[in-house]
């Protein structure tokens, strides 16, 4: 779809990455890190047009001289000034449109505090003057993008992991599980266990290097104990070239890092359920008649589900928890890194959806709380 007058802006603001583009497109046009960078030392930045704030890729490329901050933590905006800068960058520098002329669909994690959603609404209508707004629940959008109306979505991004059962298009809020453990926690754990190799990572810039190591080299062990035994016998190391040209060898850290997704106690979250338990607990909170169908449609979504072997390990562990007659089916769409965005693109281009937008006139009349009436 051309970015004509009719197309809406779809913006999936993740804790780690912003995905932005136009409704009707099959993929986001712009994907950049949700980071805002400020110079550590103003003198050091002389001659670079003296900008005081850098956003996204530009902040990433200058990370050596900047202090980087993520305004979204665990799916909740913790710094609204920086969040506004990210949205401004999205509209004017990336999708390059005037938000006053396009409806905007934003996304958020389930069980977010109400005031988070109200503040998003307020900024969109008052700062950016958008004509209409909709805020969609991330997991529900992912299910739409997989072409299903019934299933349980396990959505794991950078800040939050949640399991959301959906039946005939309706999410079942009483059965949602949310754990504030996701990709960023894996990166921090990897930073910690990489110290065993003799390399220390401490700065915000070095954290980004470790995130790259995680995304490029880590995988899930199908059997953790067996993998540990094997790695003790043969190193199974992979080389990773650091930005300064030095090469670092990464060994059993490659599978110990994502193991956190199955054993959150590794990072001190003793009470938190791992991925298999989250799915199992969510399904068990649903009506007995829909459980079998949910077990047959476990849909993965988000960047932290991209690890090699994760779908297979998840299916194996869920079938150990589920009743013996049930054969769980884990669906891992190849585009699942962006399935929240794709679902938003599909939803906002449906003619039947057009009555769902919160209009500026409704906002002016009722204030930010209007968003709870129209966005579920």
Swiss-Prot record:
EC number: 3.6.4.-
UniProt main location, coarse: cytoplasm
Cellular compartment(s): Cytoplasm, Cytoskeleton
GO cellular component: cytoplasm; cytoskeleton
Catalytic activity: ATP + H2O = ADP + phosphate + H(+)
Enzyme class: hydrolase
Signal sequence, renumbered to the chain: none
Keywords: ATP-binding, Cytoplasm, Cytoskeleton, Hydrolase, Nucleotide-binding
SMART domains xref list: ACTIN
Domain of life, per lineage: Eukaryota
GO molecular function: ATP binding; hydrolase activity
Function: Actins are highly conserved proteins that are involved in various types of cell motility and are ubiquitously expressed in all eukaryotic cells.
Similarity field: Belongs to the actin family.
Name of the protein this chain belongs to: Actin
Species of provenance: Leishmania major
Taxonomic lineage of the native organism: Eukaryota, Discoba, Euglenozoa, Kinetoplastea, Metakinetoplastina
């Amino acid at each position: 779809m051309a970015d004509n007058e009719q197309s809406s802006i779809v913006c999936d603001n993740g804790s780690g990455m912003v995905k932005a583009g136009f409704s009707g497109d099959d993929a986001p046009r712009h994907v950049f890190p949700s980071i805002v960078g400020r110079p550590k030392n103003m003198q050091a930045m002389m001659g670079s047009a003296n900008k005081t704030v850098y956003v996204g890729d530009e902040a990433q490329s200058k990370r050596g001289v900047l202090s980087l901050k993520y305004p979204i933590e665990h799916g909740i905006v913790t710094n609204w000034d920086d969040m506004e800068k990210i949205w401004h960058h999205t509209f004017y520098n990336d999708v390059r449109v005037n938000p006053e002329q396009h409806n905007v669909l934003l996304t958020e994690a389930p069980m977010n505090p109400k005031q988070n959603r109200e503040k998003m609404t307020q900024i969109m209508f008052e700062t950016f003057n958008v004509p209409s707004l909709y805020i969609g629940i991330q997991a529900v959008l992912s299910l739409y993008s997989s072409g299903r109306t019934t299933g349980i979505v396990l959505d794991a991004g950078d800040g939050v992991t949640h399991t959301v059962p959906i039946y005939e298009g309706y999410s079942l809020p009483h059965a949602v599980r949310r754990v504030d453990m996701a990709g960023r926690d894996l990166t921090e754990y990897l930073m910690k266990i990489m110290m065993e190799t003799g390399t220390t990572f401490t700065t915000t810039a070095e954290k980004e290097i470790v995130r790259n190591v995680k995304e490029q080299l880590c995988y899930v062990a199908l059997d953790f104990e067996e993998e540990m035994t094997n790695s003790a016998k043969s190193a199974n190391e992979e080389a990773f070239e650091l930005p300064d040209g030095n090469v670092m060898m990464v060994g059993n850290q490659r599978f110990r890092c994502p193991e956190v997704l199955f054993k959150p106690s590794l990072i001190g979250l003793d009470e938190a359920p791992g991925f298999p338990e989250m799915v199992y607990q969510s399904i068990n909170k649903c009506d007995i008649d829909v459980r079998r169908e949910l077990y047959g449609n476990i849909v993965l979504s988000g960047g932290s589900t991209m690890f090699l072997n994760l779908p297979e390990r998840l299916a194996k562990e869920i079938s150990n928890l589920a009743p013996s007659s049930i054969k769980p089916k884990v669906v891992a769409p190849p585009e699942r890194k962006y399935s929240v965005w794709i679902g938003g693109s599909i939803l906002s281009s449906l003619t039947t959806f057009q009555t769902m937008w919160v209009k500026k006139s409704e906002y002016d009349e009722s204030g930010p709380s209007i968003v709870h009436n129209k966005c579920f």
